[in-house]
Amino acid sequence: MIRRIVGKTLGLLGYTIQYGCIAHCAFEYIGEVVICSGPSMEPTIRNYDVLLCDNLSRHFFSIHKGDIIVAKSPDKPSVNICKRVIGLEGDKVCMSSPSALLKRHTYVPKGHVWLEGDNLDNSTDSRSYGPVPYALIRGRICLRVWPLESFGPLKESPNGRIQDNWP
């Protein structure tokens, strides 16, 4: 009797561990659901929007200018950030806010990207902490799933910061 209960308990524990490992691999390497908080990506992404993040992108496809990505924060590695890619390695990017009279530029180093929020006045991004290493990128946002009235792919940058060549 006890042997049968122990056997069933161990079997259930084994299945739980298996499914836990499968779920971990799926969320880590294939994709995950992300709930965004904070105003840095408004109006494109609002507080508590639910997004689908494609984690395969970082392994098999190139990250492009204009993509919205999820990355580990360079300042706080335990926190994920959701920002738009403004520059790729070798690109010249503007470090100043759009309202600044004197514009400062820099080049994105090899193996890094330049990230900015769409709400430039209320975003802590590469203008604060500098270029972000590719290794910190977790995935690319591909779809908004909630709220349902906004279901679908995300819009282009509303502030026009993505340019091929800065003056």
From Swiss-Prot:
One of its GO terms (molecular function) is serine-type endopeptidase activity. It is an enzyme of class 3 (hydrolase). The active site is at residues 40, 83. Its EC number is 3.4.21.-. Disulfide bonds: none annotated. It comes from the Eukaryota. Keywords: Hydrolase, Membrane, Mitochondrion, Mitochondrion inner membrane, Protease. Signal peptide: none annotated. It is found in: Mitochondrion inner membrane. GO terms for cellular component: mitochondrial inner membrane. GO terms for biological process: signal peptide processing. Belongs to the peptidase S26 family. IMP1 subfamily. Catalyzes the removal of transit peptides required for the targeting of proteins from the mitochondrial matrix, across the inner membrane, into the inter-membrane space. Heterodimer of 2 subunits, IMMPL1 and IMMPL2. This is Mitochondrial inner membrane protease subunit 1. The lineage of its organism: Eukaryota, Metazoa, Chordata, Craniata, Vertebrata.
